Regions:
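Active-site-proximal helices and loops of the catalytic beta/alpha 8
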Residues: 224-232, 242, 247-257, 314, ...
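Glycine-rich, histidine-containing beta strand-loop boundary motifs that form or position
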Residues: 41, 85-87, 145, 191-192, ...
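Aromatic/acidic polysaccharide-binding cleft in carbohydrate-active enzymes
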Residues: 139, 363-369, 410-417, 422-432, ...
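Conserved, mostly hydrophobic/aromatic
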Residues: 27, 136, 180, 190, ...
Length: 580
């Protein structure tokens, strides 16, 4: 047993309160090095009467490690614990201090979860577990009110450029809510709606005003009301890392320089502010001089931005915020942001844009979730780009899942493309079967899937600005078969809770193989998913305990033979079977 590989620490994702009564414990061991792990757990004040061994199950694995987990409901909301590691006859007891070959004589040097204090429990919005998001880039979704088109707006459907406009607005979304209801989505994520000079609106001019080319606050209220009547939640985009060049405090700074009362609203390295060899003398988003970075440690800046965060919840009843460039803003600002937002709307969804491992933001005091780009990369590598085999993919998924507490995984924002990337169908070189297979994993995985507008009807597009084409509303030019496919995926996900929050176990993910088999299981259902990520048909066989199954799409009855299911799949095929 390689003890050097064994890892655990209290709190974070290793020992945390899942709710007000339940504690999850996790421990890491070298892959395939330990055959069984148990938690020895009890109350520190009545250890002899309360201690018991709780078996742990293998939660996930990656290329180096196995991750084990168990759930404990302590009678008095506190826990003293250690671990028993077994590899056949070999046994070690792990304490906070050491590895022992005999059980510890007393609990003094074990790990401890002191008490489940309600204020410390990481609570995420329940509704997000059941959400299917649809991302809308407002300027390109639909033009519902030509009277508010920006000057120089082009006819709908032209070639997107970084600086052109087509007149998309909020009335256009209202006009096409039926499309969203028909598709089956129950949440919308809008890129920024506030006053700005660009078509993407990430250069905010006024955080308290809807951009006139999109409508006004009354239009937004109407849209949110219509969405809520249909069971659709609404998420807005906040750009609190930086403003735009026309933001009034920055305009004043440009005019008055070091004498501006707003000079401390930004990070100025040198006056007068200028751009020298392509580098501004003030901090910005990237090196973009038109997007000066805001000083969120400044009391006035903080007050203004938190007021904006509250305003749109109070006035328009929005359901949460997506936070742009979230990892470049200080943690203390986000802690205050969470307190303000959750006080107004406890089930508001706080989603950070972070493209990397995000544990520091997912400890219950800042975000509910992040945009799950490690998931995105793993899915695209395997299903789209053919990088790595099934084992590599399962390792990447296991590693990512093990990083966060379960409640954060359950509301993770799982996307495969967006306004920042090439479109999924384009990434698949137009191969719809590959696109569908990737989407089927997305919709049968823990977390909230998101469809980028137009993907459901076969829209294509390379990197920005090509991925921001005008939505195609001519039904003759829409891929209706693909639309039906997404409808069915959404229907199945919402029908079976196991596909949303059930435990995931890989039954087959072998080195050198393109085949993938995994189960999603909860108290209601057990579903096994077979995937063939190859360009030719494959027979896939996997051992199962149950005899009777049904195809959840067709309803066809399937029987296991000699303790195994044998499924023939076409190229890039997928079958989902449920125990009956």
């Amino acid at each position: 047993m390689l003890l050097e590989a064994v890892y655990h620490r209290p709190k974070l994702n290793w020992c945390y309160a899942y709710d007000g009564h339940t504690i999850h414990l996790r421990i890491r061991t070298k892959r395939d090095d330990v055959t069984a792990v148990s938690a020895m757990a009890g109350d520190k004040y009545i250890w002899d009467q309360s201690m018991s061994y709780v078996p742990m199950h293998k939660l996930a694995a990656d290329e180096l490690f196995d991750y084990w987990e168990c759930e404990i409901v302590p009678e008095y909301r506190r826990l003293k614990y250690g671990f028993l590691l077994e590899n056949g006859p070999e046994k070690y007891w792990m304490t906070e201090y050491d590895f022992l070959k005999q059980p510890p004589e007393n609990p003094d040097r074990l790990f401890e979860y002191p008490f489940i204090n309600p204020a410390d429990v990481f609570k995420t919005p329940e509704w997000v577990k059941d959400a299917v998001f649809y991302q809308i880039f407002p300027e390109r979704f639909a033009n519902g009110d030509p009277s508010i088109d920006p000057t120089g707006a082009l006819p709908w459907g032209g070639t997107p450029e970084r600086d052109n406009f087509f007149g998309g607005d909020l009335q256009g979304v209202i006009d096409h809510v039926d499309h969203l209801s028909k598709l089956g989505v129950n949440a919308i994520y809008f890129t920024p709606l506030f006053t700005a000079t660009t078509n993407h609106k990430y250069d905010t001019e006024d955080y308290m005003q809807i951009d006139p080319q999109f409508g006004n606050i009354e239009t937004l209220k109407k849209l949110v009301g219509i969405c809520h009547e249909r069971g659709i939640r609404v998420l807005l985009d906040a750009v609190f890392n930086h403003s735009g060049r026309t933001f009034a405090p920055f305009v004043d700074l440009q005019k008055n320089g070091e004498n501006s009362r707003y000079k401390d609203w930004f990070y100025i390295r040198e006056f007068p502010i200028a751009v020298q060899d392509g580098i501004p003398t003030y901090d910005t988003f990237a090196f973009e001089p038109l997007m000066p970075k805001l000083n969120t440690d400044n009391a006035e800046v903080k007050e203004y931005l938190l007021k904006a965060a509250a305003y749109w919840i109070e006035e328009a009843d929005i359901d949460g915020w997506r936070l742009d460039v979230a990892n470049e803003v200080d943690h203390e600002f986000w802690r205050e942001f969470r307190r303000v937002v959750k006080k107004l709307k406890p089930d508001a969804y706080i989603l950070g844009e972070i493209w990397h491992e995000s544990s520091p933001w997912l400890m219950g005091d800042q975000f509910d979730a992040v945009m799950n780009y490690p998931f995105t990369n793993a899915v695209l590598d395997f299903f789209v780009d053919g990088i790595g085999d099934a084992r590599n993919f399962a390792n990447a998924i296991g590693k990512q899942f093990s990083r966060y507490p379960r409640q954060a995984n359950e509301v993770a924002f799982n996307l495969l493309d967006s306004h920042d990337t090439a479109r999924l169908l384009t990434k698949c070189d137009g191969n719809k079967d590959k696109m569908k297979l990737a989407a089927q994993f997305q919709f049968t995985y823990t977390g909230a899937p998101c469809i980028y507008y137009g993907d459901e009807i076969g829209m294509t597009g390379g990197h920005d600005p090509d991925c921001r084409k005008c939505m195609e509303w001519d039904e003759a030019k829409q891929d209706q078969e693909l639309f039906s496919f997404y409808q069915e995926l959404i229907r199945l996900r919402l029908k079976y809770s196991a596909l949303r929050t059930g435990n995931l176990t890989f039954l087959s993910a072998e080195e050198g193989s393109a085949n993938l088999v995994y189960t999603r299981e909860d108290a209601k259902d057990k579903i096994v998913v077979f995937m063939n990520n190859a360009a030719k048909p494959q027979n896939i066989e996997v051992a199962v305990e149950e005899d009777s199954w049904e195809d959840i799409r067709s309803g066809e009855a399937i029987s296991a033979r000699l303790g195994a299911l044998n499924i023939k799949l076409p190229a890039y095929g997928c079958v989902m079977l449920r125990v009956v």
